[in-house]
Amino acid sequence: MIYEFLPEADEEFREASRYYENEAPGVGLAFITEVHRVISVVMLHPRAAKKVRGTVRSKVLFHFPYNLLYSIESDVILIVAVAHQKRRPTYWRSRLNTALRIT
């Protein structure tokens, strides 16, 4: 199984890592490392996280107030959002129309 980010998810991941790195050197790298750790867990156990809408599942990051939202599409883990837990909780749903089928 492989993974890929939707372009919007990739951009918000990069923005969050830049933000954390600007706040304190090394924290941006810690954020990147945590996102990749969660992706590794998801790739090992893709159906373990709870479904939050249609085929989209959510996995919480440790030490950061973010969720990794993803869908399993054939042999690809499609990352829909790297979403802050306190900001605009459902903004990513508009991405589903073009990227996924809602069931």
Predicted regions and their residues:
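Basic/aromatic recognition patch in beta-strand/loop cores that engages polyanionic ligands
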Residues: 44-78
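Arg/Lys-rich, positively charged N-terminal/basic patches that mediate binding to nucleic acids
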Residues: 1-32
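Enriched for short, Lys/Arg-rich terminal
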Residues: 67, 71-103
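Short, hydrophobic secondary-structure boundary micro-motifs
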Residues: 29-30, 50-52, 91
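Short proline/glycine- and basic residue-enriched helix-capping loop/turn segments at helix->loop/beta transitions
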Residues: 39-43
